[in-house]
């Protein structure tokens, strides 16, 4: 334990730290010689997730001095381990106890923590309290990063960036990256390219983040020519490393541009770049895209990797591989994998047999589809109610709040059929008055366990005075996930919402736009966007923007895919 402590901090410092702290935090070699020291006590406290300030106070009470560098390391360690509140407390303690004269990087770190823990408004107040002579580029960059997280604070981000420009603080790529990230989210390509030109004029070298952000933007708008030109310029330059998310987006762009050969190269590169923590997500994406590229062998190869490294106890993997095999017209392969899934004791996922049945119907195999959906196995798994006997035994003794908590816990652990059983039992036994969120939760669970058709039937039986935005969002979410053409159904739901004076919210807007985009209903998509997309609090998700861009490309409106025309 004694000898391992310094290496913990050396490994931590080897990672790229936040802001300019990378030049401030240093670990003294004398730590290697100290036994039972303050750093060792702190390490022990960190391992136990204990409070750090009492350790520091005790060290001082014993007549010892606290090294400011050690405190900065502690703050960073806490922040990196998602203990922002305690990191903020240590930062405030360092200031209150006057451990040292604070430098701009100390203020920058604290500003970031305040925004993370308390919110942007308090962070702005703290910024105003920072002495002007301590407001260096690290402080302004921290404030800029806070503003650049949302399009609601676009004006403040631009004003802060201009202030940094006026003060001559735009000497590193970090502030440029913050603005590029914001403009990319808004699909404002012109602004991103203006910033690239400004960086070039000011001799500010692009870094890894810059290159990946720009490539993702060109991928999203499907400008393969500019994407390749930019990649060729930076590929192979020291310090520039492509992220697997970037190469995956580039592969998608190539597929939309019908360059399957180039897409395949990018997908193979993605496999080389993906890290261990992201394997599950990456394999899901890879199987899907290899399927879109029409490569059955690659789908099965990645599925083999998925099983060996992730395991077979996961519905998501089976959904992805079956969908991908159907995409490459391998109905036999899809059937074989379905039989394996059917034999496993996984939570029943109606989408898997429904997907295979749809594959049968698409190929004119209607009888086979009906036989599958009416098979004893599916009926048994749908009607399996192991929770019901327990509810009959002790359910009446539970408070309504306990039952709702049970539903939430079952839902969070993806035991959807059991969660639905509890929800149905509550309704049948009338153990309490049901509220809006109860109906929304049951609608969501019904769609996940029994399918969209049953969810629609349940929706029709919900009392009109209980159909608020959460209920409508649950139904629209089901439509957005469906492979069927449901644009007309969405139109009906929107009309009903209007009659009931229920305005679309952030989630509703994104779901509706995805449905319209999936069906290439350009006019309906643009009309809905013009009406609701600019309302306060409405922000398009990246997935929504990509879906809309794909719809434009599919409709031959390539220019619109790269501009906010609505």
From Swiss-Prot:
<comment type="similarity">
    <text>Belongs to the PPR family. P subfamily.</text>
</comment>
<feature type="repeat" description="PPR 7">
    <location>
        <begin position="349"/>
        <end position="385"/>
    </location>
</feature>
<feature type="repeat" description="PPR 6">
    <location>
        <begin position="314"/>
        <end position="348"/>
    </location>
</feature>
<dbReference type="Pfam" id="PF01535">
    <property type="entry name" value="PPR"/>
</dbReference>
<feature type="repeat" description="PPR 1">
    <location>
        <begin position="136"/>
        <end position="171"/>
    </location>
</feature>
<feature type="repeat" description="PPR 5">
    <location>
        <begin position="279"/>
        <end position="309"/>
    </location>
</feature>
<dbReference type="InterPro" id="IPR011990">
    <property type="entry name" value="TPR-like_helical_dom_sf"/>
</dbReference>
<keyword id="KW-0677">Repeat</keyword>
<dbReference type="GO" id="GO:0005739">
    <property type="term" value="C:mitochondrion"/>
</dbReference>
<feature type="repeat" description="PPR 2">
    <location>
        <begin position="172"/>
        <end position="206"/>
    </location>
</feature>
<dbReference type="InterPro" id="IPR002885">
    <property type="entry name" value="Pentatricopeptide_rpt"/>
</dbReference>
<protein>
    <recommendedName>
        <fullName>Putative pentatricopeptide repeat-containing protein At1g28020</fullName>
    </recommendedName>
</protein>
<dbReference type="Pfam" id="PF13812">
    <property type="entry name" value="PPR_3"/>
</dbReference>
<feature type="repeat" description="PPR 4">
    <location>
        <begin position="243"/>
        <end position="273"/>
    </location>
</feature>
<feature type="repeat" description="PPR 9">
    <location>
        <begin position="505"/>
        <end position="540"/>
    </location>
</feature>
<feature type="repeat" description="PPR 8">
    <location>
        <begin position="468"/>
        <end position="504"/>
    </location>
</feature>
<dbReference type="GO" id="GO:0003729">
    <property type="term" value="F:mRNA binding"/>
</dbReference>
<feature type="repeat" description="PPR 3">
    <location>
        <begin position="207"/>
        <end position="242"/>
    </location>
</feature>
């Amino acid at each position: 334990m004694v000898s391992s402590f310094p290496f913990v901090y050396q490994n931590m410092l080897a990672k790229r730290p936040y802001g300019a702290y990378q030049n401030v935090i240093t670990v003294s070699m004398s730590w290697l010689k100290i036994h039972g020291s303050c750093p060792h006590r702190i390490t022990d406290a960190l391992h136990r997730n204990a409070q750090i300030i009492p350790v520091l106070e005790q060290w001082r009470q014993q007549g010892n001095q606290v090294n400011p560098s050690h405190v900065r390391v502690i703050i960073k360690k806490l922040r990196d381990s998602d203990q922002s509140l305690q990191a903020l407390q240590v930062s405030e303690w360092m200031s209150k106890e006057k451990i040292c004269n604070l430098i701009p990087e100390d203020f920058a770190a604290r500003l970031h923590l305040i925004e993370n823990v308390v919110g942007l408004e308090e962070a702005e107040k703290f910024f105003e309290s920072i002495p002007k002579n301590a407001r260096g580029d690290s402080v302004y960059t921290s404030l800029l990063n806070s503003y650049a997280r949302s399009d609601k604070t676009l004006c403040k981000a631009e004003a802060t960036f201009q202030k940094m420009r006026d003060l001559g603080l735009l000497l590193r790529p970090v502030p440029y990256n913050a603005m590029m990230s914001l403009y990319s989210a808004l699909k404002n390509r012109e602004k991103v390219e203006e910033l690239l030109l400004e960086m070039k004029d000011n001799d500010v070298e692009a870094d890894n983040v810059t290159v990946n952000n720009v490539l993702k933007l060109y991928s999203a708008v499907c400008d393969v020519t500019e994407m390749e030109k930019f990649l060729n310029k930076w590929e192979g330059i020291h310090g520039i490393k492509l992220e697997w998310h970037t190469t995956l987006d580039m592969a998608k762009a190539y597929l939309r541009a019908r360059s399957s050969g180039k897409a395949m190269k990018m997908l193979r590169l993605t496999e080389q770049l993906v890290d261990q923590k992201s394997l599950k997500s990456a394999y899901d994406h890879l199987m899907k895209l290899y399927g879109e590229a029409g490569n059955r062998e690659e789908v099965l190869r990645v599925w083999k990797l998925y099983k060996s490294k992730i395991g077979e106890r996961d519905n998501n993997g089976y959904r992805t591989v079956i969908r991908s095999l159907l995409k490459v017209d391998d109905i036999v392969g899809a059937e074989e994998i379905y039989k394996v899934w059917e034999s496993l004791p996984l939570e029943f996922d109606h989408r898997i047999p429904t997907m295979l049945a749809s594959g049968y119907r698409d190929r004119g195999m209607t009888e086979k589809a009906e036989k599958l959906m009416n098979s004893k196995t599916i009926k048994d798994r749908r009607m399996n109610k192991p929770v019901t006997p327990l509810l009959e035994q002790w359910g009446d003794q539970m408070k309504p709040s306990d039952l709702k908590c049970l539903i939430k816990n079952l839902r969070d652990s993806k035991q959807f059929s059991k969660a639905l059983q509890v929800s149905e039992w509550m309704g049948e036994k009338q153990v309490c008055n049901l509220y809006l969120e109860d109906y929304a939760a049951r609608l969501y669970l019904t769609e996940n366990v029994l399918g969209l058709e049953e969810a629609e039937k349940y929706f029709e039986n919900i009392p009109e005075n209980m159909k608020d935005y959460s209920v409508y969002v649950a139904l629209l979410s089901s439509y957005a996930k469906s492979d069927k053409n449901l644009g007309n159904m969405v139109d009906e739901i929107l009309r009903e919402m209007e009659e009931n004076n229920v305005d679309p919210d952030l989630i509703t807007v994104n779901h509706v736009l995805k449905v319209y985009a999936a069906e290439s209903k350009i006019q309906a998509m643009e009309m809905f966007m013009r009406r609701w997309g600019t309302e306060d609090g409405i922000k398009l998700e990246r997935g929504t923007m990509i879906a809309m861009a794909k719809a434009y490309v599919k409709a031959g409106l390539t220019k619109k895919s790269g501009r906010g025309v609505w």
